[in-house]
Amino acid sequence: MVSTAQGYKCKFFTVEPIFFNGQRAEQKVWDAVRSAFNDRENCLCFWTYPVFIKDKKICFEPDILIVDKELGIIVIEVKNIRINQITHIEGYNWFTQNFFKSPLNAYKQSKNQLHQLINSCNNYPLLKQKVKGRVLVALPSITESQWTRKGFSEQLCCPPILFQEDIDRDNLIQTIVQTAGQVQPGKPLEDKEWRLLQKIICGPVLPPIINEEGKTFNPLPPRRQVIEKLQQWVGSTDIEQIHIGMSIPPEPQRIRGIAGSGKTVLLCQKAAWMHWYHPDWDIALVFFTRSLYDQAVHLVNEWLKFFSNDEVEYDPETSKLKILHAWGDDRQPGLYSTIHDTQNISLIHDQRVKGNPPEKLAYLCKRVLSEYQIQPIFDAILIDEGQDLALDEQQLKFEDKQSVYWLAWQALRPVAPDTPDVRRLIWAYDEAQSLDALSIPTSKEVLGAELSQILGGNGGAWYEGGIRKAYAMRHCYRTPGNILTAAHAIGMGWLRPEGMLTGITNKKDWEHIGYEVDGDFRKIGEPITISRPLKNSPNPVHHFWSGDLLEFNVYDSCEAELNALREKIHQNIHCDGLKPSRDILVIVLGSQEESINLQKRAAQTLQKYGVDFYIPSALNSNQFPEQMDLQDKRPNQFWKEEAVTVSRIYRAKGNEAYMVHLIGFNNIAKNESSISLRNQLFVALTRSKAWVSLSGVGEYPMCEEMRQAIKNGNTFTFNYKKPLGRVIGEEILT
């Protein structure tokens, strides 16, 4: 039998490590299931899986749930009861002594759980009456001979049972199939049916796309056709994402993921799952980009509805799960303002706090940590966009730790009274999307040198029970592969004549973000080939569109660039069938002053030619937020119906569109050695779900670098030079 979590394949899911009197018995059955199904393809196995019984409005948890392409759904209810604790049996009721419950009806309980899952499958015509349903009761502390001697096997209502010796046998799968009670007959599933079953078990099934009222095209323009195909595309279930989204770690957890890998969706799922599983917990889901608020609320609500079979919806006013911007203000609470207000904190400022928003926040967090003893108010905190809360300046850190993270840590209750240094802080990040700093929220930066050993050191990569301490997400679902590789190449400077500015310098870390590497990083000047397999960029747009997905144009003047922009957007709306809002996004590149000026000029150009624009945080379309009173602004808003959003990069983070227009490339190219400016370009390129149109004014050396990055596609070869700026990477435990 395989004895370690590392030895098992990723098909096994521990929802939460649990510690109770019967745990050893459940663990024994779970270990036997994992050993038996370890080499079996097309199956998923869960240790505890909440099932909501809608008509009774209660939630049950099958101790072990097996979902198999050939065998269907199997529910195993484990009872750690000994033979002398069962006094007599009447029907399916077991009357007990010295046990926590009497009578016991394990079979009925497990059948109810299975019926709910089978009914969910039967709601879909593709699966109706096709998924086999089986149920068993496992008694790991009772042998078959003990059961027989008591006369229980002669009962007419004796349920199908896995006895102690069955669990220890090598042919457990055969025993389960022969023993289990069949609740619904069925058949082995076809590939399409199996994919749908996985979606039903692991996440919301996407509803069919309904054409909206408005302009209709007959036939559909090519780009509109592509979008509709992409909307109907449902990729195969990502086993790693199920692990991340449906597990509750007993201690800190770090999630490193490339742009478009689904970090935000997964953190919303994880927060909703934790809230559903532990409704008494105080949980905070924290993010940096304020325009993500509505998206986060929507995603959390959708996941809660899924977990509760549409019985529970998210109510920000009453829920113990709080969705918080990192800052917060008088109109909407954030992480800092919530801690500030609940602790009666009053900081006296001798002078105005200086710096950009992350620096100001870190400064205030450090002062709070230095001057106050923080009382814990949360049971779990999940942080998205973690790279934006990590700062370079030592004076903004608290001791050797990032101040914002350490304030969050102090606001957490210990997982258990006897482990005061064990707390549930979960953070996700992509170092390539950092816009203001080069620091990376590694475990050492977040927790300090001593506590960071929780995620490393002698403890290994797994917590007890089989939940990983850290993840690296390598699949990009949003951005097409060639756009992503071009974004990484230009963002890190792979093709710079002087050598890359920033990047990863070992094969293992490249593999963790989905690349294959040929070459030796230890040899300066040696050729390195980096390629990205299609399997790690599953967006299928290249199957539907034969033209360029990423185009780059240079114009003689800003006026020419903006005229080309409005012509392309006019084409997108009136000929390509794209909706102004959410299908199209304009992102302005450059420093704060440059991007503000160019944003205004671009918006005015669109309006002049009859295209409504929307500037994020404005009240209405065709308005500029800086001309509005504070109370009239909508800081959470990023889109406006029937208007094209024109955004600077800081507001655009976390958002996406099918057609992304990037303007102001020259603002990056004239200062091409700036890592933060190149990161702007990376973030902007990876907002796309299909196409990018990139443009700038005037020729710069970086223009040829951009053209070459586009030309190279998914494979790049360059002579390695040690990065001039920073080295990206942190040990990802295996």
Predicted regions span which residues?
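Conserved P-loop NTPase-based nucleic-acid remodeling module centered on helicase motor cores
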Residues: 68-71, 77-111, 130-132, 143, ...
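Arginine/glycine-rich "motif VI" loop of SF2 helicases in the C-terminal RecA-like domain
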Residues: 108-109, 115-130, 277, 306, ...
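Structural beta-sheet core signal
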Residues: 47, 75, 135-137, 285, ...
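Conserved nucleotide-binding/hydrolysis micro-motifs of P-loop NTPases
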Residues: 71, 80-83, 141-144, 290-293, ...
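Intrinsically disordered, low-complexity Ser/Thr/Pro/Gly-rich regulatory segments
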Residues: 1-224, 228
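Alpha-helical nucleic-acid-binding subdomain
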Residues: 219-236, 240-258, 265-476, 480-498, ...
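Core RecA-like ATPase module of SF1/SF2 helicases and allied nucleic-acid translocases
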Residues: 442-485, 492, 498-507, 521-522, ...
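Short glycine-/polar-rich loops that comprise or flank the Walker A/P-loop
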Residues: 41-42, 69-73, 96, 129-135, ...
